[in-house]
A protein has these predicted regions:
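Polytopic transmembrane helical bundles with strong interfacial aromatic enrichment
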Residues: 1-375
Length: 375
């Protein structure tokens, strides 16, 4: 008979919460076009990722260049001296980069379409500071990814030491493998500057999240008790199908954010998801005697989908109607919030699915963990 082990549960919960923060920051990376802010991996501008100066991470400062280069910038010309000055610490500025004059003699913007990297050049006394857009978000995303990896290792070790349930051990091993794959996908996305890899990287994140949710639930005290035997078979298939739709929607959202394509498909699946959630809520509240344990989850799914549809309309309006006429920060908040709510909806739906399977008659082994009991 297996003990409930609080430290293992705490590790699993910390890993899940850190992963949610990681996904949120990842959404900001995409929302601010900062995916290629740092040109190299696993180093950061040639430095050890963990030793990169905090001041440069926050400011995005790349290099100081001579003040006399301002003359060329004021003409909107990318000269060879400017290009050579910015080719530093793994950073390479292509010859196709363009210069935009923000404030003549003071502030300029440079965009490199090859590297998909944005720079801001600011005159400060007798020199020009070159700042890379998005370094804070991208570098933070990398550091958080490392933290998630370390927490996953600790959780996996704890489970393998303190739990004898084979299924739980293998789920923890899968979670560790998923984190490694996700980290490699993120690194390769930078090295190859690949939109396809960026989409795969974003689409794989919910799989890792689902594994972490499983670890939290399966190591919790509640899950160590004998599972209920309520027959909820009439709803768990609907919940599983809805979960699949939400995952497809997250993939379509990743494609849309990276390529600005397949908006119609994204809207269509959004309608299907909303319809299925309405069915779930209706079924749960029409028979609360049977589904009393699911009222909170159903209400949460219903609330999230209402807010999500509202933000979705806002995201469509900001990205495809107003564009740059809307304040940049407001656009980022709307689109990134829309992305993160989608992730939360997936999370709640997955939790609902696991609980429904656990409650179903014939599923009384708690995914093979019938021996997993507390003292």
């Amino acid at each position: 008979m297996q003990q409930y082990h609080p430290p293992t549960y705490a590790l699993a919960l910390c890993t899940l919460l850190t992963t949610l923060i990681l996904i949120f920051v990842g959404g900001l990376v995409t929302g601010t076009d900062a995916g290629m802010a740092v040109p190299d991996w696993p180093t950061t501008f040639g430095d050890n990722m963990f030793l990169y100066p905090l001041s440069q991470m926050v400011s995005g400062l790349l290099v100081w260049i001579p003040d006399n280069l301002a003359t060329s910038l004021d003409q909107g010309i990318l000269t060879k001296p400017i290009q050579e000055a910015l080719n530093i610490d793994e950073n390479i500025l292509s010859s196709t980069a363009t210069v935009q004059i923000v404030e003549k003699g003071q502030v300029w913007k440079i965009y490199d379409p090859v590297a998909n990297r944005f720079y801001t050049v600011i005159r400060q006394e007798d020199r020009l500071g070159v700042y890379v857009h998005g370094v804070l978000f991208e570098h933070s995303h990398r550091l958080l990814g490392t933290l998630v990896g370390l927490l996953t290792i600790a959780t996996t070790i704890s489970i393998w030491i303190y739990n004898s349930v084979k299924q739980l051990k293998w789920i923890s091993a899968l979670a560790l493998i998923a984190v490694i794959i996700q980290g490699l996908l993120g690194g390769l996305r930078v090295i190859e500057n690949s939109v396809v890899l960026a989409i795969i990287h974003a689409s794989f994140a919910p799989i890792s999240l689902a594994l972490f949710i499983s670890l939290v639930l399966l190591t919790s005290k509640k899950w160590s008790q004998p599972p209920p035997t309520t027959d909820v078979s009439q709803i768990h298939r609907l919940v599983i199908f809805t979960l699949g739709l939400i995952y497809v929607q997250l993939i379509l959202g990743a494609i849309l954010r990276q390529t600005a394509q397949h908006l119609s498909a994204h809207i269509l699946v959004a309608i299907l998801v909303a319809m299925h959630i309405i069915l779930i809520v209706r079924r749960v509240f029409s028979d609360m005697q049977t589904f009393s344990d699911f009222g909170g989850l159903a209400m949460l799914m219903g609330s999230i989908i209402i807010l999500q549809m509202t933000l979705g309309i806002g995201a469509w309006h900001s990205e495809f109607q107003l564009g740059e006429r809307m304040p940049y920060m407001l656009r980022t908040v709307i689109t990134s919030g829309h992305h993160f709510l989608g992730v939360l909806l997936f999370m709640v739906s997955f939790i609902f699915t696991l609980h429904a399977l656990r409650h179903s008659s014939g599923e009384t082994t708690s995914f093979g963990l019938s021996e997993y009991r507390s003292n």
